[in-house]
């Protein structure tokens, strides 16, 4: 049996749960319970704060978990966890920022003794030390952007996705500390346990199959027999397109193929030019 730790709230919670459900690992949640069953009796779920999950997995409380790369770095657990997968969403950057009217325009302008407010004191401190800087770290639990304007700090170190929030709060980016995405991580001892490793890899395989399918589309069409060679040359598919007879029309063939989502528009245009018709483009839930 393995225990999977998932964020109990926040921006990555919903998409992660949706991916798990699409992978076939349906989670049965009862009320506000911190634990849940899945369709597999050997895989149980624990809901926790995303910031606590790196330590829970490292310490073996959970065998596998989903969290942000920034949170792994904050808890200094990166080297102690088995990195299994980058979901490539939940993108954010941890940046140092200063008020727009500040004389600090780059990391070179930051001086020892300045105050910096952050929700990431550990990561911020280690980064500044690498830069040879000794600042006073002010730990906050939210609303970091206001700190320079109420005399709490000179700078902030906070997450941003687009930079819009910084601009709205009259802040300018001074230094990029780290870029972060959502990660699937495992306990190293759990990965060495044959039975647990099998279950963890089943979870990993299911997630990969959903993420891979998100970038693909199944395209189906009826096409003239004399154009099949030209058509199959522009839709090679994953292992070659599937071509089959149409019983009611001996001049046409049915062709199915999987193509990249970003090539759908161009491909459909070319298929129509070659005489393909009844073209269907369908999302795919999983590719194994």
Swiss-Prot record:
One of its GO terms (molecular function) is ATP binding. Its EC number is 2.4.2.17. It is found in: Cytoplasm. It holds the Pfam family HisG. One of its GO terms (cellular component) is cytoplasm. Keywords: Amino-acid biosynthesis, ATP-binding, Cytoplasm, Glycosyltransferase, Histidine biosynthesis, Magnesium, Metal-binding, Nucleotide-binding, Transferase. Belongs to the ATP phosphoribosyltransferase family. Long subfamily. Catalyzes the condensation of ATP and 5-phosphoribose 1-diphosphate to form N'-(5'-phosphoribosyl)-ATP (PR-ATP). Has a crucial role in the pathway because the rate of histidine biosynthesis seems to be controlled primarily by regulation of HisG enzymatic activity. This is ATP phosphoribosyltransferase. The gene is hisG.
């Amino acid at each position: 049996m393995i225990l999977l730790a998932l964020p109990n709230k926040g921006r990555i919670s919903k998409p992660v749960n949706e991916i798990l459900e699409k992978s076939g690992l349906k989670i049965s949640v009862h009320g506000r319970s911190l634990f849940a069953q899945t369709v597999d009796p050997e895989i149980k779920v624990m809901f926790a704060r995303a910031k606590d999950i790196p330590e829970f997995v490292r310490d073996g409380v959970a065998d596998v978990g989903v969290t942000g790369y920034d949170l792994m770095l904050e808890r200094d657990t990166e080297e102690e966890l088995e990195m299994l997968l980058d979901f490539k969403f939940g993108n954010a950057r941890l940046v140092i920022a200063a008020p727009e009217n500040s004389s600090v325009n780059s990391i070179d302008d930051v001086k020892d003794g300045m105050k910096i407010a952050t929700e990431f004191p550990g990561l911020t401190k280690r980064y500044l030390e690498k830069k040879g800087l000794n600042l006073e770290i002010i730990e906050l639990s939210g609303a970091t952007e206001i700190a320079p304007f109420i005399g709490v700090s000179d700078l902030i170190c906070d997450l941003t996705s687009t930079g819009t929030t910084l601009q709205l709060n009259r802040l300018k980016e001074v230094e990029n500390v780290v870029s972060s995405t959502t990660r699937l991580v495992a306990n190293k001892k759990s990965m060495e346990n044959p039975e647990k490793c099998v279950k963890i890899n089943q979870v990993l395989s299911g997630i990969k199959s959903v993420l891979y399918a998100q970038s693909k589309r199944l395209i189906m069409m009826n096409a003239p027999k004399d154009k099949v060679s030209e058509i199959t040359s522009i839709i090679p598919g994953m292992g070659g397109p599937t071509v089959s007879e149409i019983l009611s029309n001996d001049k046409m063939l049915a062709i199915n193929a999987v193509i990249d989502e970003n090539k759908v528009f161009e491909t459909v245009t070319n298929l129509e030019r070659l005489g393909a018709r009844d073209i269907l483009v369908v999302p795919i839930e999983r590719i194994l």
